[in-house]
Regions:
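Basic, amphipathic alpha-helical/coil surface patches used to engage anionic, phosphate-bearing ligands
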Residues: 1-400
Length: 400
């Protein structure tokens, strides 16, 4: 199997043959613009002279195809999608520009298509390398009303594709196409409660979307992680696999429900992972004023049938604030404070409490400290499964 490692967008770091391919493609693009080969219209009866006067500059995703520092990164995407075969890359670019014009993609960006699908696809946080993370939540279509509203007939399915393209276009325009910038998206597809393979309407829309993305949005996925993967999906994937390039498949990662949080944490820090997927991140609001996505969290593995104690040293009088969770709970949690005064006593901050999977996913506590010492957070895992403990804390000075 071919391997595709992280690739550079800095021209000086490209191998000589790839630099040559980029130079050749830029020359072909220049010639095509000079010869007006990139001027397309969605109206075949519109005079060519009028098309040209209305399009003095050829752009894609808001980026000019000539004389812009971001142009090289755009062209590299097409080259990589076609394994640096210049003619094939040029034809892909030309077909993409034609498709964008035929479907009025630039105008679609500003259309109002409603907010019915806001919970189906959304952006939240970044991965460890800085790529924005996009979540695709297929379980939302378990709602029969939403499913029919989205897929019941061809007109509705086409509208869904338009909405999905619009969402992607808006996300792409927030990327950084400068050399060395972040110009790809980390994709997460949540298959929990996803409609099964018998839902032909969803299957059709998925296949259509996949084809459109592969043909017209090359190299925009840094990684594609499927979480909460049910048994039947791997069979479905094997059916879809022939329609995907090897390059696309090399970016795929699959995680069962039991390993979802563990796999996400490999790529995304827990403070960036939404609470519903095992992380600590919620939309900032009055109910969560202490911690934000910028406050880093630690991850500790609690082995089966063991106790794990986290020690937080306190070197000043303050209010100590902490937040923690154990993914899936089924543990006991307690907290105590041990002053440094040599009297060998501890202060019970939180008596050991059994935490069930149905309890609040995240616990927040604070404790006012007048004597220097240490806070001990103890997790007792009586199960035969290892657990992931997430925690973070901050020190707030006492008022004068």
């Amino acid at each position: 199997m071919l391997s595709f490692k992280q690739e550079t967008n800095k021209i000086k770091d490209l191998p000589p043959l790839e630099q040559l391919s980029l130079t050749d493609l830029k020359h072909m693009v220049q010639q095509a613009i000079t010869n007006k080969d990139f001027y397309f219209t969605s109206n075949p009866e519109e005079p060519t002279s009028e098309i040209i006067s209305n399009h003095e500059e050829i752009t894609i995703w808001g980026i000019p195809l000539l004389k812009d520092e971001r142009t090289d990164v755009v062209l590299l995407k097409f080259l990589r999608a076609r394994e640096f075969k210049v003619n094939e890359s040029f034809n892909m670019l030309k077909n993409t520009l034609r498709w964008r014009k035929a479907f009025s993609i630039d105008e679609l960006v500003d259309e109002s298509l409603g907010d019915d699908l806001d919970k189906v696809v959304f952006m939240h946080g970044n991965d460890k390398e800085g790529h924005p993370v996009c979540y695709n939540v297929y379980g939302e279509f378990e709602n029969k009303e939403l499913y029919l509203k989205t897929f019941a007939d061809e007109e509705k399915r086409t509208r869904f594709l338009k909405w999905r393209i619009q969402f992607l276009e808006r996300s792409i325009r927030k990327l950084d196409f400068r050399p060395g910038g972040i110009s790809t998206i980390f994709q997460v597809s949540d298959l929990k409660n996803s409609p099964g393979p018998g839902k032909k309407e969803l299957r059709w829309a998925t296949k259509q979307a996949l084809q459109l993305l592969q043909d017209n949005y090359p190299e925009f996925v840094s990684k594609q992680v499927f979480i909460n993967v049910p048994w039947w999906y791997l069979a479905f994937y094997s059916m879809m696999s022939p329609f995907m390039t090897q390059r696309t498949k090399s970016k795929f990662v699959f995680a069962s429900p039991a390993r979802t949080a563990e796999v996400l944490f490999k790529y995304v820090s827990p403070e960036h992972v939404p609470i519903q997927y095992g992380g600590l991140s919620v939309d900032y609001c009055d109910c969560n004023p202490e911690f934000t996505i910028d406050d880093s969290a630690a991850v500790v593995t609690v082995k089966p049938m063991t106790k794990q104690t986290v020690e937080i040293i306190v070197n000043e009088k303050c209010t100590l604030v902490w937040e923690l969770r154990v993914v899936g709970w089924e543990v006991s949690y307690g907290a105590e404070y041990v002053p440094n005064n040599g009297d060998n006593y501890t202060i019970n901050v939180q008596k050991p409490k059994k935490m069930a999977p149905t309890d609040e996913p995240v616990i927040s506590h604070s404790y006012k400290i007048n004597e220097l010492g240490k806070l001990l957070l103890t997790i007792d895992n009586p199960t035969s499964k290892k657990k992931k403990l997430l925690y973070r804390f901050k020190v707030e000075p006492l008022p004068e």
